[in-house]
Each structure stands twice: as structure tokens, then as C-alpha cells.
From Swiss-Prot:
Function noted in UniProt: Usually encoded in the trnK tRNA gene intron. Probably assists in splicing its own and other chloroplast group II introns.
Record GO terms (molecular function): RNA binding
InterPro entries listed in its UniProt record: Domain_X, Maturase_MatK, Maturase_MatK_N
Biological process terms in GO annotation: mRNA processing; RNA splicing; tRNA processing
Chief site of localization: plastid
GO cellular component terms, A-Z: chloroplast
Organism the protein comes from: Cynodon dactylon
Name the UniProt record assigns to this protein: Maturase K
Superkingdom of origin: Eukaryota
Cellular compartment(s): Plastid, Chloroplast
Family: Belongs to the intron maturase 2 family. MatK subfamily.
Keywords from the UniProt entry: Chloroplast, mRNA processing, Plastid, RNA-binding, tRNA processing
Phylogenetic classification of the source organism: Eukaryota, Viridiplantae, Streptophyta, Embryophyta, Tracheophyta
Disulfide bonds: none
Length: 513
């Protein structure tokens, strides 16, 4: 316990931040509006034009916030469907959204200041390529070949919203901000039942995605903080310096409560999980723990994680959410790829001194493929095909111009090929390409009230083929002088791009299931 208190003491912040007064500054809401416009996922305010920022409405909001009965009416009428202005639906929803977006920016300020003041950050080199999602797979390919067991973990969520508020108390000490956060959570819990009757936050409305992400990141960082501490204590090697997202000042007090609920659990933890070859990878709620240890050790980790969630977060974790598998006998889905380590090894021949010395080495292979059935299911959900993969037209796009229709279908196809370029088997991608191409042709034929055959004869299939294979032709020119590279002739080349920083829209639902 003393070691943990010392570790927790290093992480805590001695400076208090009072951010509530910033909510009365007009520029905060201008920043929130700019984030909505420049973000990768735009937000619509109930059909109104988000490109217009009304400073007059913001000034009215600030004036209302100075009034004494501003929050009292809302608190005394929690079952009302509208906030701030019950007589006008537009103003009510505009005020609630712009206020929640501004609040999300304000509460992020202490964490940003803490990162800027961290002396260790200057010693850590900045590698922009590490932001890429594809940078995870070379790491898996390098490390997982030597490991034995794999644990699939789903981080328990939702949890009681009061726990989320308590997590922020370690960095935000002004009481009004915490009460305002409670107000938002209660407000959205009564609006369309976005939070369950048990008052556990699951998903905020998409209009408040920034606040939802901030709360979720705070929760996940707390979840990972203790795992990082155990990893440092159980490892025989010094870990690379890393900084957690959330610092805390009363973390040891929670651990004392944790120890009372489960006597002796913490004291045995250090030697209980000694494993110098433990690797941890997470994206969103999906977590992978890989180890070279025994099956008994992995079962101990599973037991620990279940009890940790129950006694520390007051959340019951279903044991079936943590699955144990042997790497050589199973495959796992991660970031839209289906990965496994086949039992059969492949031969690598090395030659030295002009073929005088030949060395044959048997090596394992980390195989990654694009899952066909889930991707076809995503296309079916987006109404590009049926559940069995039969292409259909896209009626809602028939009002667009021919070029816009071709551009949308072509962009979707290129994005799929680009994201799944690391797949060792391209047959699935070519099937998806066929579905999108025929769906595009049927959409254009439906727009012009013609048959697909008649439309294709008039337009010609060459244009569609060149449109969809533009990226393939570029790669064939790039690799023409060095290797016999062809998307159509080979299905085993894998390319990991370091410019992909977000999951494709059709792939993202697969990562949440």
C-alpha cells in the first residue's frame, strides 16, 4: 500500500483549477462552434443551419445564467422536455447544446494544462505516425508471435454517473462545475431516456459527443491507471515513460476501501501477477491482454479484473466479457480485422556469401484478413445490398447529380480498400467492390428510369472501372520497378498506412459489437 500511495502521490496535481467562471465568457462558445464545424463528425442542431453562429443568442444565454432562478427552475422541474426556455423548442435545444459544448471545452482545460506542465513530456519524442490506427498492427505482428495466451476484454460501461463525477473531482475542485455536470447528466437522463433508470450513463445524444467522449476517456484512464501501476511493479524491466490522461489526489483513499471489501487482495497483487511479457492494447472498449505465461496466470488476471471492477467502480462485470484463448488455436477481431497466428509455420531462406551459406528458418506468421460477413452486414445496414450480399439501389441518392453519385460510391470503395490494405486475402474486398459498383449502376439506372444493361451500354463500363481502380493503378505504377505488384494478380500483399487516424464509417460499427 505504501508503494501505491507513493506512486499515486507523484501523479496528483497540487494546483487547483476553477473553470466555472469561464462559462460566462462569450469566446468559449465561439470555440465550441468552431469545433463543431471543423470536427470530423459534424453536428446538426435539430435541422437549423450550424454554419451560422449567433453571438446575440449566446449573449442572451450568458445574461440568463446570471439570473438567480436560471438553474432553479430546471432543477425543480426535472421532467420537463425542454431546458432554459420552455416556451420555445428551438431556443431550448440551442441553449442546451451550446452550453454543454462550451462546458466540455471548459472542463478539458485543466487536463490540457497538466500535460503542458509535465516535465517528462519534453523527453518523449513526438512521432506523428504513432497516431495511425495501422501502427498497432506492426506492433502486434512483432510481439504476438512469441506469446501463448490472449484475453479479450470489454471495458465495463455504462457505470453510475455519480462515479464519473467523482473521477473529475481529482482535477476540478470548483463545486459549481461538478454540480453543472450532475445537472447535465440528470437532464439527459430524463430526455428520451438516454440514461437508464439506474442512472448509469450509456450514451449522450450525438449533439453532445464531445462531452460524452470526455467523460468516457476520464473513466477509461481511471480504469487503466491501476493496471499501469501493477505493470510497473510486476515488470523486471523499466517501462517507457508514459503519462496517464487523468491525475488524482485521493486515489489511495479509494484503495483502502477496496482493501476492506476484499481483505488482503491488494497485498498479494504484486507477486500474484508477475509476468514480464504482458502486452496491453486497447481501442475504444476493446482490450487485448497477451502473455507468454501459463493458463493459470491468465485465469488469475481474469479473476482480478472482475473483482477490480466490482469493488473499485461498484460495477458488476460479467465474467463472460473476458475471454481466454490460445493464440495458435483461435482468431480475434480487432479494429475491423480478423487476426490469428496459424499453427503452420512458413519457411524463410536466407543466403549469405553468394549462396555459399544457406539458412532455412521456420517462422510463425501473424495473419490479418478482412471479415467478409460483418462487412457485408455493414453494407446491408447502409442499404447498399441485401443481407445475403445482393446489390440494390440507393434511392435516397437519386436526387444527386451523376457525378456526385459516382463520387460517393467511389469514395466508399477507395476507403474500404485503403483501410483494409493490410488484409492478406483480397477476395473479400473485391466482392465488396462488386457490390458497390453494381449498386452504383442500379442507382444511376433508377435515377434515369432505365435498366442497368441499357444504362451500362450507354455509359460504358470502362468509366466505372477506371473510377474505382484509380488507386490500384497508382500503386501498380509505384511498385512496377521493384516488384510484380498487382491488386488483381496477388492477394497476399499487405500494406499498413500511417495516415489513417480514424476507423472507416462502415468498419466502426464492427468495433463496437
Amino acid at each position: 500500500m505504501a508503494k501505491f500511495e507513493g506512486y499515486s502521490e507523484k501523479q496528483k496535481s497540487h494546483q487547483q483549477y476553477f473553470v466555472y467562471p469561464l462559462l460566462f465568457q462569450e469566446y468559449i462558445y465561439a470555440f465550441a462552434h468552431d469545433y463543431v464545424l471543423n470536427g470530423s463528425e459534424p453536428v446538426e442542431i435539430f435541422g437549423c443551419n450550424t454554419k451560422k453562429f449567433s453571438s446575440l443568442l449566446v449573449k442572451r444565454l450568458i445574461i440568463r445564467m446570471y439570473q438567480q432562478n436560471f438553474w432553479i427552475n430546471s432543477v425543480n422541474h426535472p421532467n420537463q422536455d425542454r431546458l432554459l426556455d420552455h416556451s420555445n423548442h428551438f431556443y431550448s435545444e440551442f441553449y442546451s447544446q451550446i452550453l454543454s459544448e462550451g462546458f466540455a471545452i471548459v472542463v478539458e482545460i485543466p487536463f490540457s494544462l497538466g500535460q503542458l506542465s509535465c516535465p517528462e513530456e519534453k523527453e518523449i519524442p513526438k512521432f506523428q505516425n504513432l497516431r495511425s490506427i495501422h501502427s498497432i498492427f506492426p506492433f502486434l505482428e512483432d510481439k504476438f508471435l512469441h506469446l501463448h495466451y490472449l484475453s479479450h476484454i470489454e471495458i465495463p460501461y455504462p457505470i453510475h454517473f455519480e462515479i464519473l463525477v467523482q473521477l473529475l473531482e481529482y482535477r476540478i475542485q470548483d463545486v459549481p462545475s461538478l454540480h453543472l455536470l450532475r445537472f447535465f447528466l440528470n437532464y439527459y437522463s430524463n430526455w428520451n431516456s438516454l440514461i437508464t433508470s439506474m442512472k448509469s450513463i450509456f450514451l449522450l445524444k450525438k449533439e453532445n459527443k464531445r462531452l460524452s467522449r470526455f467523460l468516457y476517456n476520464s473513466y477509461v484512464s481511471e480504469y487503466e491507471f491501476f493496471l499501469l501501476f501493477l505493470r510497473k511493479q510486476s515488470s523486471c524491466l523499466r517501462l517507457t515513460s508514459s503519462r496517464t490522461f487523468l491525475e488524482r489526489i485521493h486515489f489511495s483513499r479509494k484503495m483502502e476501501h477496496f482493501g476492506v471489501m476484499y481483505p488482503g487482495f491488494f497485498r498479494k497483487t504484486i507477486w500474484f501477477f508477475m509476468d514480464p511479457l504482458m502486452h496491453y492494447v486497447r481501442y475504444q472498449r476493446k482490450v487485448i491482454l497477451a502473455s507468454k505465461g501459463t493458463l493459470l496466470l491468465k485465469k488469475k488476471w481474469k479473476s482480478y479484473l472482475v473483482n477490480f471492477s466490482q469493488y473499485f467502480f461498484s460495477f458488476w462485470t460479467q465474467p463472460q466479457r473476458i475471454r481466454l484463448n490460445q493464440l495458435t488455436n483461435s482468431c480475434f477481431d480487432f479494429l475491423g480485422y480478423r487476426s490469428n497466428v496459424p499453427i503452420n509455420t512458413f519457411l524463410v531462406r536466407n543466403q549469405m556469401l553468394e549462396n555459399f551459406i544457406l539458412i532455412d528458418t521456420r517462422m510463425k506468421k501473424f495473419d490479418t484478413t478482412a471479415p467478409g460477413t460483418p462487412l457485408i452486414g455493414s453494407l446491408a445496414k447502409a442499404q447498399f445490398c441485401t443481407g445475403s450480399g445482393h446489390p440494390i439501389s440507393k434511392p435516397i441518392w437519386t436526387d444527386l447529380s451523376d457525378w456526385d453519385i459516382l463520387d460517393r460510391f467511389g469514395r466508399i470503395c477507395r476507403n474500404l480498400f485503403h483501410y483494409h490494405s493490410g488484409s492478406s486475402k483480397k477476395q473479400t474486398l473485391y466482392r465488396l467492390k462488386y457490390i458497390l459498383r453494381l449498386s452504383c449502376a442500379r442507382t444511376l439506372a433508377r435515377k434515369h428510369k432505365s435498366t442497368v444493361r441499357t444504362f451500362m451500354q450507354r455509359l460504358g463500363s470502362v468509366f466505372l472501372e477506371e473510377f474505382f481502380t484509380e488507386e490500384e493503378q497508382v500503386f501498380s505504377l509505384m511498385f512496377a520497378k521493384t516488384t510484380h505488384f498487382s491488386f488483381h494478380g496477388s492477394h497476399s500483399e499487405r500494406i499498413w498506412y500511417l495516415d489513417i487516424i480514424r476507423i472507416d464509417d462502415l468498419v466502426n460499427p464492427l468495433t463496437l459489437n
